[in-house]
Amino acid sequence: MACLNVANFGPIKRIASTRKGLEERKVTMLIGPQGSGKSTLLKLLCACHWLEKAYAKGLLAQNAFQTADLLKHQFDYYRMASYEQEDTVIDFQGEVLHLSYRHGKLDVDFKQGGQPPAKLLYVPSERSLVSLMKDYKAMRKLPESLLDFMGDYDSAKKYMVGDLNLGLPATSARYDAGCDQMWILHSKNKTRLEEAASGYQSLTPLKLTVEWAGNLQGKEDGDSLEERMARMKQRKLNATDASFGFLNFVEEPEQNLYPDAQVRVLNFLLSMANLRSQNKLMVTTHSPYLLNALTLAVKAGQILQVKKTAGKNMVRILPLKAAILDDDYAVWQLDEKGVVRKLEDFHGLPLDENFLNTAMGKFNSDFGKLQELEDEN
């Protein structure tokens, strides 16, 4: 189990709750207000896993870790260079590396016999832009993480066979390779992705690319040689044996989607995480619907452990493939002060007292106060 401890980096001041910091689980969810550091944590996790994988695959030798430039390049890659402070601390305990960054100095311990890292996919919040930018390779001012995701999306389209089920009623996506055009099919209508609703523009790249990466069996991305070295290495890392698992980092799966569709997307992501025991899913969210959907998935896992026959009726509520064990998830909440805390559980389920439910509760409270004003004489 990988762990990440962070202090004084961007909006993040410290990680409370445990001495090890944030401990990854099969499913890790980050919740909190806008600008509290959810994406920062997600990017740091992905960056550290990328460095670990690059070392394990021989793309980075031990002497490459002698300076902090390697980690600082990751800050640049994710546009977090300005986040570093004089007292920044980053400590990552992985399978084959222990990275410790303090006062601008990087120390690394190399472990022996660790399990090779999994494939990595980072799905950025800006993913809806991919439908608007076909000539993305010429757009060097875009974030590198977004450019890499666009490259992954292009690769996924090449391997697309038939229509892509978007998990929504009577809706699918179809790719026309001849004119490099993605279409959204809804009932009898056919719409170009770039002209479709914003929810489709966010959902289609996410679902197609995650399915491709999660099922990738050693396929190389031919376009990677045209990218600069950082991107080329990223491509090679993702062309690995799928038996080593799949690490999926997703920003805001709920983006531009109706609540019911948000739940469907999370169930899809959970199902992909359950394809292999080594797979992991890490997501950021502002949505109470996703947290509630995760709670349902955990409860389903609890029931299936003791009552196997419950699955016949459970499929009416959620896909059985989305059910997870109660010790296979963790929810971490970030506050406006930059403190990260693990959300406690109640009988294995996420505690109701969290930021997202508090926001919903305040709405109900304010509505009640307005009703009281209305009833005053």
Regions found by a protein language model. Give the residues of each.
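Pre-Walker A-like glycine/lysine-rich segment at the N-terminus of P-loop NTPase domains
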Residues: M1-C46
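Phosphate-coordinating catalytic segments in nucleotide- and nucleic-acid-processing enzymes
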Residues: M1-G10, L45, H49-F249, L320-N377
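Phosphate-binding P-loop
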Residues: T18-R25, L185, A239-S243, A273-R276
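Conserved H-loop
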Residues: N248, N279-Y289
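Walker B catalytic acidic pair
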Residues: E251-P253
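Conserved hydrophobic alpha-helix in the ABC-type ATPase nucleotide-binding domain
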Residues: R264-L269
